Every structure is written in structure tokens, then in C-alpha cells.
A protein has these predicted regions:
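Active-site neighborhoods and metal-handling regions in enzymes and metal-associated proteins
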Residues: 1-492
Length: 492
């Protein structure tokens, strides 16, 4: 899947990618009388009282783990900056994933914000300054909780009583509206907050460009806490309602020249009203386009008798996203070949679900799905005669993996080590997708022509529990009967 612009790994102390000068277009008077006039005669505007956000204790626990791991190191976690689209227009800002995970600040995070871990002096001992390994261990024992003071730096919006209110399009409330103050954010997130102007970088700062830090922060997200799982269930539920919107308006897609675009827009409308945005670019692939794994052009027709593969997810305000795929018969009923392929993919998905539990390795979930795919295409006679058993010929029809971790990023924890991801032992709290598929491209001479142009994927979001796993998206129609009834109901 293709993620939207995420503003990752950028310099600190800036909110925009480039400096924009609009002097050639227009300018305001700098006359003192005008400035005085603009800065006076404003009445008080009531604001919502700040309250502690439910994420605060969870984010604090995450920061404590980071602090213990990087004792004596000054860590600088930047939110990132707005990315330029053209001239003085910018993409919607999305903070760096690790910044959001450690602060709890999601969709309304301030561009240019910086989270800083300053070592506590009494804990400032490391391998470089210690004489023995016991020195390091002893210091850690003395500083069993936080070994840093943590400060969140960001620029408040400029109020009506400053020149920047109307003269600065980056922070002026005349331009961007009122934003939470330092005090409000401090109360909500349980963090010490200071103006970004007070932030000073040092030569020893460890930033997100540091491979060890980036790796640790990604691995920190491998097991989700209760808050995260609840947010992901919200995202999945919102996504399910978005799929309902698409199904209920499928007629408008069928009658449009670019019906896939209608499907995409229908889901986007729901994502923006029910959440923050989509978690990644929507794949609305009808007919043979479903055989293109990351089809995001979405400019084709939606025709009766074909299948529609919809791969989409709502990102909620906390920035956690769902990642769901359903493949539906546009006419409301699968033909025999479509049904044959669909039921095979469903069987593969169910086989993967069945083995997902604590104690097995992550890749064993994938292996269970692939075993079904391999056996079915062999039974259908699609594989070479006497194939080399060591070669996965069946992967011609499903080249992607079955599972990936899910969270704030659609492909979460991507910088985790292989032994912590692909070869990891499943633990309660891990959240990942199960998404087997089969794709038979037009012109594939290894399969009968009646299979050409059929692409099917079924994707659900799974959380590992103490004694097994739970399908967060089980309520979204999956079986042949459920899917057919779903489409038929929507197209009445």
C-alpha cells in the first residue's frame, strides 16, 4: 500500500519545508497606527478548559521505557514539518509516528514540535564514563523510573494581541485559527511544555536519524497497550461503516465513467467525517485492476459481472489506522470461477486465523495461509509438472506476504529487526493483518482464460490475546453468502 505524505525524519525547529515570501503578491502596511489598530479592540473568546487525555499515562509508560534504554543520552524526537506541495500550499501535516507514540499528540500536533529527553544528572552515566559494567547497572538501579526530564517544545499560535496574529501565516490565528496553548497541551498530555524558541540543539543529540533509536522505537510499538487496541478497534469500526457507504452507493459507481474514482471518493468522504483521513491511499480496483497489488490510480469503470477489490482504512484522530480489504461481486452474485477463487482465499485466511496465538512465530501465520494457496493451485493444475518442491511456484499468483504489523503506521514497526518481526514469537497485544489473495493477470498462460482478470484479497485486522487471537474486523461481511447479501442489500 502507498502511504500518504508522513513528514518523517526532518529537521527540527521549523514548521515549513521552505521559506515562503509573498512580497511580490501583496504586503500589509507596517505603519505604527495600523499595527496598533490591528492589535486592539478584541474581545475575549472563551476556550475549552484543558483536561487530562486518556492517552497520557500510556504515553508516559512508553517514555519511561525509552528513558531506561537510552540513559545518559540526550534524545530529540522531532514531530516533523509541513511538506510543500507548491509555492505556499502544503500537504496536510502528519507528525512523525514515534513523536505521536511518545507524546500521545495526534492529528492536531503542531508542526515543528520537538520532544526532548534531557538526562538527569544523577543518572548520567554510560559505557563511555563508567569504569565497569557494574557502574552502569548501579546507575540504572538508582534511576529505576525516568532517567530523563522530558520537555515538549512547540510554537503556540499567535493571538490577537501580537503583530504575528495577522502578519504570520505559520502561527497567526488570523490564518490558522486558535490552537491549544502550552498550558493546555501540558495538562492534556502530562508533559512539561515550553516555547520552541527555547529549544537548543547540541552536537551530542540523538535524533530519529540514529539507527539504534529508530529501531528501538519501532520495536516499542510491536506490542500494543490497551489504549492502542481500543483506538484500532475504533478505526476498524469506522472503516466498516465506510465500506457500507461504498456498497450502499455502488450504483453511482457503476453508472460513472470512472467508477473506481467514485468508490475512492465515497470512502474518502467517510474517512474525513468519521476520522482524520485515510491511513493510506485507497485501492479501489475493479475487474482486472484487482490483479495490480497497489492499484491507486482508481480511474477505471466498475462493471456488472466483475469484482471490486476495496483496500482501505480510516485513520482516527489519534492517528491509529485500520487496514481492511474486501472483494465483492459488483452484480451481487459471484459466478462459479469467482466463487471458486474467493472461497480459496477465504479458506487461506481462516487457516491463518486458526493458528494465530501466543507462542508461535509470526511467519507461521503466513505459512498457514500459503499452504492452502499452494495446495489449491496445485489441485487446479496451474503448477509445472513435477515442480521442484523447494521452489514456491504458487507464489506466481500471490507474491505478497500474508501479514504485517499495524498501528499508527499502516505498515507499522517497519524498522524492527527481522528476529523481532518475521521470526518473532507472537505475544498478547500484537496487532497485524491477515490478507491472503489470488491474482490471475490477463494473458497468464499458466491458467485457463476464464480465470484471467480475477483478483481476490480478503484482509482483516487481528489482535493476539492471552489464549488465541481476535478478529477486530469480523463484523465486516466475509463469507460468500454474507458478501452477496451485503451487495444485494446495498443495490436495492
Amino acid at each position: 500500500m502507498s502511504d500518504k505524505n508522513t513528514n518523517q525524519n526532518v529537521s527540527v525547529c521549523a514548521s515549513h519545508e521552505v521559506k515562503i515570501d509573498n512580497f511580490s503578491r501583496t504586503t500589509l502596511s507596517v505603519d505604527s497606527k495600523f499595527l496598533e489598530y490591528m492589535s486592539n479592540n478584541w474581545g475575549a473568546v472563551p476556550s475549552e478548559p484543558a483536561t487530562v487525555h486518556e492517552v497520557a499515562p500510556y504515553a508516559a509508560a512508553r517514555r519511561a521505557k525509552v528513558s531506561r534504554k537510552f540513559a545518559a543520552k540526550r534524545l530529540v524526537i522531532a514531530a516533523g514539518i509541513m511538506k510543500q506541495r507548491a509555492n505556499d500550499t502544503f500537504y496536510m501535516f502528519r507528525p512523525h509516528t514515534s513523536f505521536t507514540h511518545l507524546t500521545g499528540w495526534g492529528a492536531n500536533a503542531a508542526p515543528g514540535a520537538v520532544l526532548v529527553f534531557d538526562p538527569v544528572a544523577s543518572c548520567a552515566i554510560s559505557e563511555d564514563t563508567a569504569t565497569t559494567a557494574d557502574d552502569v547497572a548501579g546507575a540504572a538501579a538508582q534511576c529505576d523510573s525516568m532517567q530523563h526530564t522530558v520537555t515538549l517544545y512547540f510554537a503556540e499560535s499567535a493571538t490577537r494581541y501580537s503583530k504575528e496574529f495577522f502578519d504570520n501565516s505559520e502561527v497567526g490565528e488570523f490564518w490558522i485559527g486558535a490552537k491549544p496553548s502550552l498550558k493546555q497541551v501540558s495538562t492534556a498530555l502530562g508533559l512539561n511544555c515550553k516555547p520552541i524558541a527555547e529549544f537548543q540543539s547540541t552536537a551530542d543529540d540523538v535524533t530519529l536519524d540514529n539507527a539504534a533509536l529508530a529501531e528501538f522505537l519501532d520495536e516499542l510499538r510491536l506490542v500494543k497497550d490497551d489504549y492502542e487496541i481500543a483506538q484500532m478497534q475504533l478505526a476498524v469500526n469506522a472503516t466498516g461503516r465506510g465500506f457500507d457507504e461504498v456498497i450502499n452507493n455502488l450504483d453511482s459507481a457503476v453508472t460513472a465513467e470512472r467508477g473506481e474514482r467514485v468508490v475512492e471518493v465515497m470512502f474518502h468522504k467517510h474517512a474525513r467525517t468519521a476520522g482524520n483521513w485515510e491511513g493510506y491511499d485507497t485501492i479501489a480496483a475493479a475487474g482486472a485492476h484487482a490483479c495490480t497489488l497497489h492499484w491507486i490510480t482508481n480511474d477505471g469503470p466498475v462493471k456488472e459481472g466483475e469484482l471490486l477489490l476495496l483496500d482501505a482504512g480510516v485513520e482516527v484522530e489519534s492517528l491509529y489506522t485500520a487496514d481492511i480489504t474486501r472483494t465483492v461481486p459488483i452484480s451481487g452474485r459471484f459466478n462459479e470461477i469467482q466463487k471458486k477463487v474467493y472461497e480459496t482465499v477465504l479458506e487461506a485466511a481462516d487457516a491463518a486465523h486458526k493458528v494465530a496465538r501466543p507462542g508461535i512465530k509470526f511467519h507461521e501465520v503466513h505459512d498457514a495461509a500459503m499452504a492452502v494457496i499452494a495446495e489449491k493451485v496445485k489441485q487446479w493444475g496451474f503448477l509445472p509438472d513435477n515442480p521442484d518442491p523447494e521452489l514456491p511456484y504458487h507464489r506466481r499468483y500471490m507474491v505478497h506476504g500474508t501479514c504485517h504489523h499495524l498501528g499508527i503506521d499502516v505498515h507499522d514497526c517497519a524498522q524492527a529487526r527481522r528476529e523481532m518481526y518475521y521470526n518473532a514469537i507472537l505475544e498478547p497485544g500484537m496487532v497485524f493483518t491477515i490478507e491472503p489473495g489470488l491474482y490471475f493477470h490477463p494473458g497468464d498462460l499458466t491458467v485457463p482464460e476464464e480465470f484471467w482478470g480475477i483478483g481476490v484479497r480478503i484482509e482483516d485486522d487481528i489482535v493476539v490475546t492471552e489464549d488465541g487471537s481476535r478478529n477486530l474486523s469480523a463484523h465486516i461481511p466475509r463469507t460468500v453468502a454474507e458478501v452477496e447479501a451485503w451487495v444485494q442489500s446495498g443495490r436495492k
